[in-house]
């Protein structure tokens, strides 16, 4: 395969606009899976997604030029799904299933376009909102994050000369390859790329994906990035995200409905998908409360993705719950995906090996680890915790608690109401870097 010289490309900016988002498929696969369900079941729900910089010490509006940001957002607005992309979505097999996307949904999707954005700045931060039907606004999450992340990378490299850029990418490649060699020592490990939203750049993500494909072979199970899956003949991977229970909970009218909201999401999901896509994301309002109130049928699902508890503690709690429900954990799947670095992956692998099926969704540490790679110290390569979350549904505030209080999102009064209702049992505060 012909690999572009990334350093040369970064250095030679002779074009008017170098698009960060090249396709509406440059997103996570679970956004399309969720979109089909949202379009089918919740066509009249309006939501707001909001960019949230959890690393307040990093002033994004000082690092990133507003004109460049608007140009990239405007370019994303201009994108439509191409005929080739629609044929691929219709004809490809995903998770062993053909026609996972129904013809009526694809007919609607071919004319899809992102809704307008609202951008202002305050105290060194960008205030970025996306309003509109849930079936449209949801698709801004990944492009918005990838645009901010790559613009930050470009700003960091703006004053590097050609030689310094060569050194930067040579060191980053060596750093990445040393991680690949570390993973090769773990028999039967399953690794996938979950690094789109906070990647250094699209070209760098592609290089990392191809490095994993070359380096660990069948242990590399695929990528969450739909465009890269299509381009590199990999599996497109992903299930569902916190936005589903966040929105459904925000729409409830009483405590009984609020209690049932996380499980209503699973029932909706099961109407659309099955088999290996039956993965539970338990931590939106706290894993402990979710497990305590879960109907027995939840234990029949394929697996869980513990997303905010420490991986070993979170995995052990779910294994214990499976055993309480009479299930053999060795037949179940745990997908670990929260702030993983290669050492955490290795430790978690050794801890659970032989006790449960495992897979690791490797994100920012895979696609944006440039710390120490530049010839001189560049602060803007330091880790940034940036998210784009649903904050309102039909005018009501949406909340995410999570097992880590540092990740709590929402209106303070609503957060307290949710804490009073769901509790905070077994919440563990951990620093968040990504």
Curated annotation (Swiss-Prot):
<dbReference type="Pfam" id="PF17767">
    <property type="entry name" value="NAPRTase_N"/>
</dbReference>
<dbReference type="Pfam" id="PF04095">
    <property type="entry name" value="NAPRTase"/>
</dbReference>
<dbReference type="InterPro" id="IPR036068">
    <property type="entry name" value="Nicotinate_pribotase-like_C"/>
</dbReference>
<comment type="similarity">
    <text>Belongs to the NAPRTase family.</text>
</comment>
<comment type="pathway">
    <text>Cofactor biosynthesis; NAD(+) biosynthesis; nicotinate D-ribonucleotide from nicotinate: step 1/1.</text>
</comment>
<dbReference type="InterPro" id="IPR006406">
    <property type="entry name" value="Nic_PRibTrfase"/>
</dbReference>
<comment type="function">
    <text>Catalyzes the synthesis of beta-nicotinate D-ribonucleotide from nicotinate and 5-phospho-D-ribose 1-phosphate at the expense of ATP.</text>
</comment>
<keyword id="KW-0597">Phosphoprotein</keyword>
<dbReference type="InterPro" id="IPR007229">
    <property type="entry name" value="Nic_PRibTrfase-Fam"/>
</dbReference>
<protein>
    <recommendedName>
        <fullName>Nicotinate phosphoribosyltransferase</fullName>
        <ecNumber>6.3.4.21</ecNumber>
    </recommendedName>
</protein>
<dbReference type="InterPro" id="IPR041525">
    <property type="entry name" value="N/Namide_PRibTrfase"/>
</dbReference>
<dbReference type="GO" id="GO:0004516">
    <property type="term" value="F:nicotinate phosphoribosyltransferase activity"/>
</dbReference>
<keyword id="KW-0662">Pyridine nucleotide biosynthesis</keyword>
<keyword id="KW-0436">Ligase</keyword>
<feature type="modified residue" description="Phosphohistidine; by autocatalysis">
    <location>
        <position position="242"/>
    </location>
</feature>
<dbReference type="GO" id="GO:0034355">
    <property type="term" value="P:NAD biosynthetic process via the salvage pathway"/>
</dbReference>
<dbReference type="GO" id="GO:0005829">
    <property type="term" value="C:cytosol"/>
</dbReference>
<dbReference type="InterPro" id="IPR040727">
    <property type="entry name" value="NAPRTase_N"/>
</dbReference>
